[in-house]
Amino acid sequence: MVTLGTLKYGFERLIHRLLEILPADAEVLWQSGSTGVGGLGIEGCESMPEDELAAAMREADVVVSHAGVGSALTALEAGRLPVLVPRLVRFGEHVDDHQNQIATELESRGLAVNVTPDALDLETLLVAAASRVVTGSEVGC
């Protein structure tokens, strides 16, 4: 599953990179936010109710997300090691680079993979898909 949040800024760099590296037969749920996906051969939904997004993340093999706090925490609560791709201000994807700080901190704690669109590859997705995060409910908290 791919989630780009609901920001007014597009994140075309990530969509285009995923289309380059994903196998043609990959089944992907694209929550594309305001990122235009017309003409790309995919069906994106602009937004999803929070409970549906959480359920989709629990069912997904891998979660690729912008590095928004809500998306990252929802993926972790679903037991997924999210692949976080921060939006960057220099590409007009956000107002500042706080998503880079979020992704860097989560990766330093072993709670996410932080990667740029250019460095994202299939191997990264496979490693994240093979990983799980233990949630509080699983350890009796």
Segments (PLM) and residue ranges:
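Donor-nucleotide binding loops and adjacent catalytic segments primarily
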Residues: 1-59
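Conserved sugar-transfer catalytic core signal across GT-A, GT-B, and GT-C glycosyltransferases
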Residues: 14, 71, 102
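C-terminal amphipathic helix plus adjacent low-complexity
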Residues: 26, 30, 123-141
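Short active-site oxyanion
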Residues: 27, 59-63, 110-112
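Short acidic-hydrophobic, aromatic-tinged amphipathic segments that line or gate anion-handling sites
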Residues: 44-47, 112-122
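Short acidic active-site motifs
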Residues: 51-53, 121-124
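A donor-sugar binding/catalytic signature common to diverse glycosyltransferases
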Residues: 53-95
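Catalytic binding pocket for nucleotide-activated donors in carbohydrate/polymer assembly enzymes
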Residues: 81-117
